[in-house]
UniProtKB/Swiss-Prot annotation:
The keyword Transferase applies. The gene is dmaW. Keywords: Alkaloid metabolism, Transferase. One of its GO terms (molecular function) is tryptophan dimethylallyltransferase activity. Belongs to the tryptophan dimethylallyltransferase family. The keyword Isomerase does not apply. Catalyzes the first step of ergot alkaloid biosynthesis. Ergot alkaloids, which are produced by endophyte fungi, can enhance plant host fitness, but also cause livestock toxicosis to host plants. InterPro entries: Aro_prenylTrfase, Aro_prenylTrfase_DMATS, DMATS-type_fun, Trp_dimethylallylTrfase. It comes from the Eukaryota. GO terms for biological process: ergot alkaloid biosynthetic process. This is Tryptophan dimethylallyltransferase. The lineage of its organism: Eukaryota, Fungi, Dikarya, Ascomycota, Pezizomycotina.
Amino acid sequence: MATENGPDKSVYETLSLIFNFPDDTQRLWWHSTAPMLAEMLQTCEYSVHNQYQQLGIFKKHIIPYLGVYPTKSKERWLSILTRYGIPFELSLNCSDSVVRYTYEPINEATGTEKDPYNTLAILDSAQELIRIQAGIDLEWFTYFKDELTVNMTESEYLRSNGLVNCQIKTQNKLALDLKGDQFTLKVYMYPELKSVATGKSLHELIFGSVRRLSLKYNSIRAPLDMLDDYVTSRNMGANGEEHLPLEPRLLSCDLMDPHKSRVKIYLHERKVSLSAMEDLWTLGGRRTDSTTMDGLNMVRELWDLLEIPTCLQKYPAPFLELGQIPREQLPSMANYTLHHGDPMPEPQVYFTVFGMNDSKVISALTEFFKRRVWNGMARKYRAFLQNSYPNDDHESLNYLHTYISFSYRKNKPYLSVYLHTFESGSWPIFPDSSTAFKTYRRCDLSCKDNGLDDKLLSPVCQLRV
């Protein structure tokens, strides 16, 4: 809404004028990521009050745990959360218009002798969130952290013996689902280093930890047994490229009352194909009910719309450099939710679209939204991304979308997108701010008024590829 003094400032712009930051690192994190978060909240029609609330929580309680602001010249902790090692990622539940973000908590001790493998920062971050959100329960967090991440003795053993080279160093991360002015919290655990330290396989660590938990919470035992049987039978039948083993990769759970919390086990599938996705969806033919088949038809529909190349992939290593244009394809993935009292694990499959043309991905998603009569999302989705990255050539970008997840329960489809979240909005804000992702920057754009002091702006046309 415009006034006689000009257009109203956005929530992000207003907060940017009000907020003080303790250092340049937090200021840069805010201006690099908050524009896209604000745009997503607005797209999903969060009330103005809730937009202010959620952006305030992000600034005060999340940004201080993102660590060194990533640049090409600074040494930093590399997070498995993104291919660029950036420890923050926005995602959007398109079916319910729910905003979500995930981050790997990082502090000053991360990567030092005090905490070489970032075991401890998450403890402080979780405690800070408990103080502002009712209903967070750490029982399962504490249990799985002990089971799946290294303790100080194991950390010293790994460090002193030089056993950590190219393994995933990330051990844990947190995710917030934003519900009005509240949020729910989830934790993810990667036991790669625990496997090295203990000599136990990832399968033994992940499935074993859940099996021991089921001694107390027997209501998750049946779906665990079903999933374990599927993975074991798949792996026993592995015989080369046609039938590849499934590799457990990580585990997540809701940080709430354990009787309401869900455990999710994530499996890594190297074969990228529709047949592999069908096998993941049906647990090798174990799920054959009508709901499963209805969901499978939509999986096939998405596969056809997205046109993902069929291939055999390992997870690439090492990380991509900031600003590097991906020339790669990621392997597939699925997670399985173990619901209390439900004997059948619930699948969620991931379409790996990182490295594919983002404009084509948007077109495919928009068509899927239209077919589901998600008219608001169909109308707004492309504009949301264009507004989040207004200075980029969106016909050329191929790194905004990382994954598209799909599940189907109670006769309803659920689709989420996982998005590159860095240097969004009218970046660069400050004349001396570096820009890593500039290959597809458009140099024909003049600076737009972003509500900040004009002296802080740097014209986009000054960027050089």
